[in-house]
Amino acid sequence: MRLIFLGPPGAGKGTQAKHLTERYGIPQLSTGDMLRAAVAQATEVGKRAKAVMDAGQLVSDEIVNEIVSDRIDAPDCAKGFILDGYPRTVPQAVALDRMLEEKNLKLDAVIELKVDEAALVRRMENRVAETVAAGGTVRSDDNPEAFRRRLQEYREKTAPLSEHYARTGRLKTVDGMADVKTVTAEIEKILA
């Protein structure tokens, strides 16, 4: 099972991916985690990524695509994977399609969690309040202003992926505002 989760920050992608990882025994592939692992393991592409990051620049699509390609080849991805945070742009999606085709693999579904942005901001504020009340540490980007910037970036760069995958017939939409169990049940129906 090969999946992509789409949706803005705070939509519940990580929560749903964790459930599917446990249920189906497939890894959740986070771009950030893959990048850090490639750098730590000093792979060829990891060395190139490190040089770019050390120079204070953004890692190119070419390098990110290569890191994803290498990760998909890992033994734990034999039964499938869930991509989280990749692709972020239509050019990355096109590269992923080409990459999977070359490996004789296909995406089973692209699941978009549709959410109300104002409700997302409230959800984030509640999460911060609960974390603080429990004595936990709050992420630096978990404040309303930073969160709104992340939503704006999502709208500009990542939201066009919905149209791309809708054109290919692979996009499935789920109401991400429902409770976690309901969202999980809807995703399970799509995957059945």
UniProtKB/Swiss-Prot annotation:
The keyword tRNA processing does not apply. Monomer. Pfam families: ADK. Residues 126-142 are annotated as: LID. Its EC number is 2.7.4.3. It is found in: Cytoplasm. It catalyses: AMP + ATP = 2 ADP. Consists of three domains, a large central CORE domain and two small peripheral domains, NMPbind and LID, which undergo movements during catalysis. The LID domain closes over the site of phosphoryl transfer upon ATP binding. Assembling and dissambling the active center during each catalytic cycle provides an effective means to prevent ATP hydrolysis. Residues 30-59 are annotated as: NMP. This is Adenylate kinase.
